[in-house]
């Protein structure tokens, strides 16, 4: 990865889903990065109460190397952003793939810290080097512990694989669900053509929850730029 890492933290908390502690997640994340000797390598930008109408603009304004989503997800729906009234507005893996394609080469890691985000990642995993997802429902506290441990290691020059392994191990240390997170490595799509023989053509074998109490307005999409250098709800 390049010397400078731009981390974009996005959170959504629809009113019709259970409230989660995204504020705690970004606070812990920032503290672990800020306490590292390598803290100046990270530039962290955070947005809360993100609506579907905000998503593309935010990425255009802040093209990230790492995109971190903190919120709800569903195996069939994708991740849950908000509509203008603060209600659930699902965004599918295919829609994210269309967005991530624009940032291919810049966007290196996608971290979807919400329930059941594994299935949707198949739509875009070939566009990024690493995708971190949850393969089932996960407790909010466990999700925060996992994310905190991952960035703590990454900020201390560990590889993505090592940072992921240490984050999973932290869940084991704390006796939390260590089987929910998955690390997916990027896939480069290749056109597979059937092998041709004299006799015949041989066909190839193809071998998450957070909520708000008030309607969302433009002013409620809050942004926080973190200056460099310085629980039992279910996430589903």
Name each region found by the language model:
Residues 30, 97, 147-151:
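Predominant activation on well-ordered alpha-helical scaffold segments within soluble catalytic domains
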Residues 38, 42-45, 105-203:
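Active-site-proximal C-terminal subdomain of hydrolase catalytic domains
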Residues 52, 66, 101, 120-121:
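Cytosolic/nucleoplasmic/matrix-facing N-terminal domains/tails
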Residues 69-71, 155, 227:
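Short glycine/serine/threonine-biased micro-segments
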């Amino acid at each position: 990865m390049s010397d400078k890492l731009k981390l974009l933290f996005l959170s959504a908390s629809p009113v019709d889903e259970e409230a989660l502690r995204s504020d705690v997640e970004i606070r812990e994340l920032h503290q672990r990065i800020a306490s590292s000797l390598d803290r100046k390598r990270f530039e962290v930008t955070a947005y809360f109460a993100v609506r579907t109408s905000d998503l593309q603009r935010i990425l255009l304004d802040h093209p990230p190397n790492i995109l971190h989503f903190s919120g709800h997800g569903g195996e069939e729906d994708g991740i849950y952003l908000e509509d203008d009234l603060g209600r659930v507005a699902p965004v599918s893996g295919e829609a994210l793939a269309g967005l991530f394609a624009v940032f291919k080469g810049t966007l290196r890691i996608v971290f979807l810290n919400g329930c059941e985000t594994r299935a949707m990642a198949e739509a875009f995993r070939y566009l990024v080097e690493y995708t971190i997802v949850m393969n089932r429902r996960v407790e909010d506290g466990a999700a925060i512990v996992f994310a905190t441990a991952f960035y703590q290691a990454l900020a201390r020059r560990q590889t993505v694989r090592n940072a992921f392994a240490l984050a999973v191990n932290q869940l084991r240390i704390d006796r939390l669900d260590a089987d929910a997170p998955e690390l997916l490595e990027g896939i480069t799509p290749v056109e597979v053509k059937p092998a041709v023989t004299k006799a015949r053509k041989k066909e190839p074998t193809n071998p998450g929850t957070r909520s708000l109490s008030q309607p969302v307005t433009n002013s409620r999409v809050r942004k926080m730029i973190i200056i460099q250098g310085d629980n039992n709800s279910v996430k589903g």
